[in-house]
């Protein structure tokens, strides 16, 4: 039976994390390497799928490595091709989720079927739906999709429910940026506004360093490293490391020997990057985050001075220039009480506890990040639900036909803030047919938008005259059907089984190697101490196992391994018993000798007088 626990997952662009509620406290679950975050990297090698640190480590030499897939979630038609097979962002994300799920299950000691997954607050409907699909493919029932800044606020405010505070969460991750303004009080987490940029994050800061290195190297050596895939991967790793180093030191050394080759032999890259130069290179990126901060405050109808607490979330907020900028804009020293890499997963676990009832007296009121509406006459975008409306919510509006005797209306569903439909994001299209013939403007068509607690949109159109209704649940723009998701789920399960089988094979082969080594050692130890027949029996079993190993017959290897293990165990027991017996005989002889020595003792004993010396007598 599966655990009733709901795990909290921060599915990040660069790194991901998973947490679970223990009692009333959320706890990060470390991965198998002992790290509290896991690189969001997937690699394919020799038919095996690798996820996390092991995938990231070999990215330089393996072209079949996928990173930052989150930046393509909900992107129509986007696929990654590996060895002739195409993978959608949902499938790749599902592999990361499966990996997190697996070590969470190891920690909990039970099967996990439910999760709360976080997304950037500024993710649109298609991106949210794609995230939910990824969870489904990974074998998880996604109980709730919540916004990352909101999750961070939950982690911060869980033990501060008696305080009334206005909180600004500045969330700069690996590939996305969000800012949310919340009001906390009496256990209610009320999101007042949210804003952001789904294509701005730490990866962009890395790219600035890479561009600087490429330009400098080209100027010095006449070689363009941007054309060399392997060199680019090395540059990316070095840029990321330099960025992290500059959070603690004022100058970082970048050393990449043998990065390329010129006419006179190998070329090496040696550079020093000062924090001041890094700040200069990335100043425009930091500045890009200012407008969303101002807009979020404006939408919440607040001034910067009204904010009580500023929370920094996301690894990129460790950059000193970012911290200084936020402090300058808000007039507040950022709160550092929560780990920016872990807060989102912890908050997701808290929300999981709210759903199961393990966390009491906490109410989360989130908002929709973008306005929703339909296209009307002249290509105009008519909003039905404004951005920053608390969800879940429902809104209806009555429209009519644009021509006489119009038999059908096309409903073009959009999300965005621009006045013209063409400038906004299309979520879907559907048609309401069989409208009775009538003059233009007479039919009454009621369009209703429903947004559920996950921010997923449902739209219906109803002819008020005939009560005929048509509904649509907005799917991700990848357009994954239920059948496609089902197929991907089955593939994911098959891959999981294949990975388990492959691991079992490797474990068995390792055990066989270890047993053969142990057998040779034991046979040397027992030589001359057990009968030749027993040694021959062990040697025959060893040779049979070697033959199964050479044939790579797994079942035969298991059987022969068990046979040899029993024989070697029996020999080891005999050897141990023999050693004990010899030790016992030796002890007995030693005891007799000791008695004899004791009898002789008086003949050579000299008694001595002694007296106590008092140190005070010497003074």
From Swiss-Prot:
Which factors induce or repress this protein, as stated in its UniProt record? By stress conditions e.g. heat shock.
Compositional bias, Low complexity, is annotated for 583-596
- Quote any Pfam family the record assigns: HSP70
Which keywords accompany this UniProt record?
ATP-binding, Chaperone, Nucleotide-binding, Phosphoprotein, Stress response
Q: Which GO terms describe its molecular function?
A: ATP binding; ATP-dependent protein folding chaperone; unfolded protein binding
CDD domains given in the database record:
ASKHA_NBD_HSP70_DnaK-like
**Where is the sequence biased in composition, kind Basic and acidic residues?**
597-619
Residues that span the membrane, as ranges: none
InterPro entries per UniProt: ATPase_NBD, Chaperone_DnaK, Heat_shock_70_CS, HSP70_C_sf, HSP70_peptide-bd_sf, Hsp_70_fam
| Region called Disordered, residue ranges | 579-619
Which superkingdom, per the lineage?
Answer: Bacteria
Q: Provide the positions where the record notes the PTM Phosphothreonine.
A: 176
Outline what the protein does: Acts as a chaperone.
Q: What family does this chain come from, according to its entry?
A: Belongs to the heat shock protein 70 family.
Extract the PANTHER family matched here.
Answer: HEAT SHOCK PROTEIN 70KDA
Q: What name is this protein filed under?
A: Chaperone protein DnaK
Organism of derivation: Levilactobacillus brevis (strain ATCC 367 / BCRC 12310 / CIP 105137 / JCM 1170 / LMG 11437 / NCIMB 947 / NCTC 947) (Lactobacillus brevis)
Gene designation per UniProt = dnaK
